[in-house]
């Protein structure tokens, strides 16, 4: 793959943030310097994801998907799609980049063929409530779809069969994730709880089985995202309570609490901790929050290593890739 020197794609570490100010910003992770800003005209950005080959970044918003080139300084999206109604809340990619998946408020999860330059919707999975999150099993053959009725759907892409889990009815599933080892699935909800399942099967033609493992009363307010670390030893949960909490997957005990709460009693809330992403070595985590900042933290000590300031409104999503392609 060719990368142009001086572009985002030429940097071994790609960090992008976006939110309510209609921009996507790219940062030099170690220095905190903003290296590129892309205008995202039509709406806020709800979700960001970098393609596995690090050539493009997808940004989803209200009724559209935009894909920007990371290997040039072209300010305009190189792929645009406007044929989905309402907010698109979630986006991700098959590991070899053949297709992309999305989910949104129109109650559908979709699979898009990326091999043609115009986005073709290949498959649609319809549910009965707006979708908040979609995550791909490491086997690349099952999608987990979380909706606002509190249901997690496991959509088997090979058979089109689906199973449903309803850990806490009436509380919206806001985020779900499976660890890279495919040992656990976690889901968080609008009550602030985190549910963890053990995974078995999911290899070859075996269907994945989910066995309830634990329920963590992770947050006292709305939980917004959960993410396992690349080494599968940690689970992070982000919340409207201004914290991101890091849990050990060995026993799901709390290891570190990352907080943006002010130590000044007179200062009002700095807002929600919207999302997070681990570094490839699982030692650091980047968070996005309503106080217009992204932050880089040391996972073990909870120390803030870097702040990324420049957004004019809340930062609600980020994408982080520091893996070196072989």
Swiss-Prot record:
Residues with Phosphothreonine modification: 51
Q: In which tissues is it expressed?
A: Expressed at highest levels in the brain and testis, followed by lung, heart, kidney, skeletal muscle, spleen and liver. Also expressed in epididymal, abdominal and brown fat, small intestine and pancreas.
User: What turns on expression?
Assistant: By insulin in adipocytes (at protein level).
- SMART domains the record matches: WD40 (SM00320)
Give residue numbers for the modification (N-acetylmethionine): 1
Organism domain of life:
Eukaryota
Name a single GO cellular component.
Answer: serine/threonine protein kinase complex
Q: Which Pfam families match?
A: WD40
State the name under which the record lists this protein.
Target of rapamycin complex subunit LST8
Concerning PTM, the database record says:
Phosphorylation at Thr-51 by CDK1 promotes ubiquitination by the SCF(FBXW7) complex, followed by degradation.
Provide any one GO MF term from the record. Answer: protein serine/threonine kinase activator activity
User: Quaternary structure?
Assistant: Part of the mechanistic target of rapamycin complex 1 (mTORC1) which contains MTOR, MLST8 and RPTOR. mTORC1 associates with AKT1S1/PRAS40, which inhibits its activity. mTORC1 binds to and is inhibited by FKBP12-rapamycin. Within mTORC1, interacts directly with MTOR and RPTOR. Component of the mechanistic target of rapamycin complex 2 (mTORC2), consisting in two heterotretramers composed of MTOR, MLST8, RICTOR and MAPKAP1/SIN1. Contrary to mTORC1, mTORC2 does not bind to and is not sensitive to FKBP12-rapamycin. mTORC1 and mTORC2 associate with DEPTOR, which regulates their activity.
Q: Does the keyword Zinc apply?
A: no
Its source organism is: Rattus norvegicus (Rat)
Q: Locate residues linked as Glycyl lysine isopeptide (Lys-Gly) (interchain with G-Cter in SUMO3).
A: 86, 215, 245, 261, 305
Family from the record: Belongs to the WD repeat LST8 family.
> Where would one find the signal peptide in this protein?
none
- SUPFAM superfamilies for the chain: Quinoprotein alcohol dehydrogenase-like
Q: What does this protein do?
A: Subunit of both mTORC1 and mTORC2, which regulates cell growth and survival in response to nutrient and hormonal signals. mTORC1 is activated in response to growth factors or amino acids. In response to nutrients, mTORC1 is recruited to the lysosome membrane and promotes protein, lipid and nucleotide synthesis by phosphorylating several substrates, such as ribosomal protein S6 kinase (RPS6KB1 and RPS6KB2) and EIF4EBP1 (4E-BP1).
Q: Give its localization.
A: Lysosome membrane; Cytoplasm
Cross-link named Glycyl lysine isopeptide (Lys-Gly) (interchain with G-Cter in SUMO1), sites: 313
What CDD domains does the database record attribute to this sequence? WD40
Q: Where is this cross-link: Glycyl lysine isopeptide (Lys-Gly) (interchain with G-Cter in ubiquitin)?
A: 305, 313
């Amino acid at each position: 793959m060719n990368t142009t020197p001086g572009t985002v794609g030429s940097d071994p570490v790609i960090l992008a943030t976006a939110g309510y100010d209609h921009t996507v910003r790219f940062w030099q992770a170690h220095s905190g310097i903003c290296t590129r800003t892309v205008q995202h005209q039509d709406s806020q950005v709800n979700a960001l994801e970098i393609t596995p080959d690090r050539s493009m970044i997808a940004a989803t918003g209200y009724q559209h998907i935009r894909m920007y080139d990371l290997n040039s300084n072209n300010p305009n999206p190189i792929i645009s799609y406007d044929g989905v109604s309402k907010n698109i809340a979630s986006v991700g990619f098959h590991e070899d980049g053949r297709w992309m998946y999305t989910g949104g408020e129109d109650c559908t999860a979709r699979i898009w063929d990326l091999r043609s330059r115009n986005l073709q919707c290949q498959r649609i999975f319809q549910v009965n409530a707006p979708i908040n999150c979609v995550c791909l099993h490491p086997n690349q053959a099952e999608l987990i779809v979380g909706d606002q009725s509190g249901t997690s759907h496991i959509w088997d892409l090979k058979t089109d069969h689906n199973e449903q889990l309803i850990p806490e009815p009436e509380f919206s599933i806001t985020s779900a994730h499976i660890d890279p080892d495919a040992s656990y699935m976690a889901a968080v909800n609008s009550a602030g709880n985190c549910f963890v399942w053990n995974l078995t099967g999911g290899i070859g033609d075996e269907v994945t089985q989910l066995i309830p493992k634990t329920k963590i009363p992770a947050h006292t307010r709305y939980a917004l995202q959960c993410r396992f670390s690349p080494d599968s030893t940690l689970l992070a949960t982000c919340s409207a309570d201004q914290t991101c909490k890091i849990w050990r997957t060995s026993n799901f005990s709390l290891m570190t609490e990352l907080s943006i709460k002010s130590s000044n009693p007179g200062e009002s809330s700095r807002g929600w901790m919207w999302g997070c992403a681990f570094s490839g070595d699982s030692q650091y985590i980047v968070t996005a929050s309503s106080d217009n900042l992204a932050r880089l933290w040391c996972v073990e000590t909870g120390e803030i290593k870097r702040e990324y300031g420049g957004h004019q409104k809340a930062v609600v999503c980020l994408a982080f890739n520091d893996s070196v392609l072989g």
